[in-house]
Curated annotation (Swiss-Prot):
Upper taxonomic lineage: Bacteria, Pseudomonadati, Pseudomonadota, Gammaproteobacteria, Thiotrichales
GO MF terms, alphabetically ordered: rRNA binding; structural constituent of ribosome
Role noted for this protein: One of the primary rRNA binding proteins, this protein initially binds near the 5'-end of the 23S rRNA. It is important during the early stages of 50S assembly. It makes multiple contacts with different domains of the 23S rRNA in the assembled 50S subunit and ribosome. Forms part of the polypeptide exit tunnel.
Biological process (GO), any one: translation
A UniProt-annotated Pfam family: Ribosomal_L4
Name listed for the protein in its UniProt record: Large ribosomal subunit protein uL4
Coiled coil location: none
SUPFAM superfamilies registered for this protein in UniProt: Ribosomal protein L4 (SSF52166)
Family indicated by similarity: Belongs to the universal ribosomal protein uL4 family.
Database matches in PANTHER family: 50S RIBOSOMAL PROTEIN L4, LARGE RIBOSOMAL SUBUNIT PROTEIN UL4M
Gene3D superfamilies: 3.40.1370.10
Organism of derivation: Francisella philomiragia subsp. philomiragia (strain ATCC 25017 / CCUG 19701 / FSC 153 / O#319-036)
Length: 207
């Protein structure tokens, strides 16, 4: 199948052939949801830790005798009902990682890319280069392409500091190379702009 190519000025500039297996796959919402949730869960640190009554410092002695005081019986001042006591159901470090095999992951990415094409939210440009880090110049490119809330995906060799510096101060605009794309970044933006080189690298990885 072919996708239209636009110049950075927004004009038609030809077509590029792409693999139907990558850009015309069936939409699988449940798979996308599962992979996105797993990806975001894997990003959690899971390092939160609290102390139970047995781990809190102090509280070795019985605070008062068992009977005769009129007070409720107590065996330690580190009980959860006391100030400075332990936590009843203390949080412990845990891993939130979920298993997602390569076939599921690549299937979700293909499904997202294909839906971007079908919904006319994907744009392909010849290349994307800036000689100097100028936010104003990058803003002109974004406006010329007529896209908002957009992720620019470039080839590994095309990505440089100029692109990063030029785009980082623009609201709802981001730039990454083809290696860094993931299901979350693809679904978080309304539009995605790919360079020809990025398309080629993604196909090599997914086909």
């Amino acid at each position: 199948m072919d996708l239209n190519i636009k110049s950075l000025a927004g004009a038609e500039a030809g077509v590029v052939g792409v693999a139907e297996g990558v850009f015309a796959a069936d939409y699988n919402e449940s798979l996308i949801h599962q992979v996105v949730v797993a990806y975001m869960a894997g990003a959690r640190q899971g390092t939160k830790a609290q102390k139970t009554r047995s781990e809190v410092s102090g509280g070795g002695a019985k605070p008062w005798r068992q009977k005769g005081t009129g007070r409720a019986r107590a065996g330690t001042i580190r009980s959860p009902i006391f100030r400075k006591g332990g936590v009843t159901f203390a949080a412990k470090p845990k891993s939130y990682k979920q298993k997602v095999n390569r076939k599921m992951y690549s299937g979700a990415v293909k499904s997202i890319l294909s839906e971007l094409v079908r919904s006319d939210r994907m744009t392909v440009v010849e290349s994307l280069r800036l000689e100097t880090p100028k936010t104003k110049e990058f803003k002109v490119i974004v406006d010329s392409l007529g896209v908002k809330d957009v992720l620019f995906v470039v080839g590994v060799e095309e990505f440089n500091e100029n692109l990063y510096l030029s785009s980082r101060n623009l609201k709802n605009v981001a730039v990454c190379d083809s290696v860094e794309i993931n299901p979350v970044s693809l679904v978080c933006f309304e539009n995605v702009v790919f360079t020809k080189q990025a398309i080629k690298e993604i196909e090599e990885k997914l086909v």
